[in-house]
Regions:
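Terminal, non-catalytic protein-protein interaction segments that mediate quaternary/complex assembly
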Residues: 1-166
């Protein structure tokens, strides 16, 4: 059986609209939603080989605030090489915003208005196209609910924006 991700990819191919621009031809759908349960995600990750060790190392480097691309390369991660020697306005910067937000949530115990915006800001020194992520933390019946909207810098290549609820 085809998983939900492949089903929506099939919808894009079969009934998606076509857009031509200076970067080529893309197919897309509007107003579609892909909801994935933990089982769906497990199915996706288990059905494809992924570099789990590299992803874990990369996340650890992000969380440490590491910006030197050479450190990522030492961990066997070379997909940031195109950025130059230093990651500017990227994931390590984003992770720095989380501790103050977590402290605010613990201090104020507010049900809403707990969010952080990650934006490849215009005018800021950057070696990457802007990405946009908005992460909102809500407290619902004593449990933490996370909603995240993410638009990749690769959106111009036809990659989707994603909304996650965890």
């Amino acid at each position: 059986m085809m998983n939900k991700y492949y089903e929506i990819l099939k919808q894009i191919i079969v009934s998606g609209k076509t857009q031509h621009n200076r970067k080529g031809c893309i197919r897309y759908l509007l107003n579609e939603q892909l909801s994935l349960s933990p089982v769906d995600l497990l199915d996706m990750f288990e059905s494809h080989s992924i570099a789990r060790k590299k992803l874990k190392s990369e996340l650890q480097l992000f969380m440490q605030g590491e910006r030197q691309v050479e450190r990522y390369r030492e961990a066997g991660i070379n997909w940031w090489d195109y950025c130059g020697s230093v990651l500017v306005n990227s994931y390590p910067t984003y992770f720095e915003k989380l501790p103050p937000l977590i402290a605010k949530i613990n201090r104020e115990k507010r049900n809403s208005k707990n969010y952080v915006l990650f934006l490849g800001e215009t005018g800021a020194e950057s070696n990457q196209a802007p990405c946009l992520s908005l992460v909102q933390f809500q407290i619902d019946e004593g449990e933490l609910v996370l909603s995240a909207y993410q638009r990749s810098s690769d959106a111009n290549l036809g990659l989707p924006a994603d909304i996650y609820h965890l």
